[in-house]
Amino acid sequence: MSEQGDLNQAIAEEGGTEQETATPENGIVKSESLDEEEKLELQRRLEAQNQERRKSKSGAGKGKLTRSLAVCEESSARPGGESLQDQTL
């Protein structure tokens, strides 16, 4: 009986070590999934930043376009602009 008790105890200990080894494996899986989640979150943040940059660049482009039109309007709004050059000659 003592041998069976020793065997049962050994089996129970082995089962315990299997559970202990299973826990770190689960921890590794969790840490890998956390790493993947962190990577996904970083990618989302980068994409959001890139979209904001694109919007700001497109907005800046519109501002430049508006300014260039304003310059054209000013130069075309001066009907006497050519006469000023003729007067200096």
From Swiss-Prot:
Keywords attached to this entry: Acetylation, Calmodulin-binding, Cytoplasm, Phosphoprotein
Residues annotated as carrying Phosphoserine in the record are 33, 56
> Post-translation: what modifications?
Phosphorylation at Ser-56 favors interaction with CALM1.
Principal location listed in the UniProt entry: cytoplasm
Report the domain of life of the source organism: Eukaryota
PTM sites of type N-acetylserine: 2
Q: Where in the cell is it found?
A: Cytoplasm
Task: List the biased-composition ranges (Basic and acidic residues).
Answer: 40-53
Q: Which residue stretches does the UniProt record annotate as biased composition, category Low complexity?
A: 9-25
Give a Gene Ontology cellular component term annotated to this protein.
cytoplasm
Q: Where is this region: Disordered?
A: 1-89
- Gene Ontology MF: a single term: calmodulin binding
| Record note on quaternary structure | Interacts with CALM1.
Function field: May act as a competitive inhibitor of calmodulin-dependent enzymes such as calcineurin in neurons.
Name by which UniProt lists this protein: cAMP-regulated phosphoprotein 21
Please tell me the species this chain comes from.
Pongo abelii
